[in-house]
Amino acid sequence: MKRFALSVALPLLFVLFALAAIVHVTGPGWSMWGGETDSGPQVPRAPAPPAGSLSIPVEGVARAALADGWRVSPSSRHGHHAIDIPAPAGTPVLAVADGRIEKLSEGERGGAAIYERSRDGGTIYFYAHLDHYAPALAEGQAVSAGQVIAAVGTTGDAEAGAPHLHFEVHRMAPGEAWWQGREVNPYPLLKGAG
């Protein structure tokens, strides 16, 4: 029995010492879930909008039809930090809040996309896989909640047979540009309590 206990205990102790050494060497600024972490001073960010405070960004879609698509991968910083709202191609995409068009972009992943900055500057709303922008939509243009800004599509890496709006929300610190900020799950902001 003693021999069995030693054959189990010794390898277990070795593993524990090895883990302790790794933690000691890597220090507090490392995370096994996402690589390097920011151990510097935290920059204050704008508070997220209250739950249910945003307009639904696709015309004709009810709050009850929304599904939470937020996924975070425990092994990396990647995941799906958005909500996908399926709709027929060409369905109007609406601004979720009053704001200003910060950037119109065309990319491999998001395809035709819009970055809208909230009126207070503390939030970016990202609309992707758009078929096209609304006529005369331009960077710097003020938009109102519910205003048509684009149409649902399948541009970028969206599946050709599955048109949808990919919608993200990013909380911004003062001075951060449109591509920065911290992702916030948009589902509760759109869905709300009812």
Predicted regions and their residues:
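A generic structural motif
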Residues: 86, 117-119, 170-172
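Hydrophobic alpha-helical membrane-insertion segments, chiefly the h-region
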Residues: 11-29
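Extracellular/periplasmic catalytic domains that process cell-envelope and extracellular macromolecules
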Residues: 57-59, 76-77, 108, 120, ...
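N-terminal Sec-pathway targeting helices
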Residues: 1-15
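Zn2+-dependent peptidoglycan hydrolase active-site motif and core
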Residues: 96-139, 162-166
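Solvent-exposed loop/turn segments at secondary-structure junctions
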Residues: 72-73, 92, 106-109, 121-123, ...
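Surface-exposed, glycine-biased beta-strand/turn segments
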Residues: 23-112, 145, 154, 183-194
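Conserved, short, structured surface segments that act as functional micro-motifs
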Residues: 123, 141-194
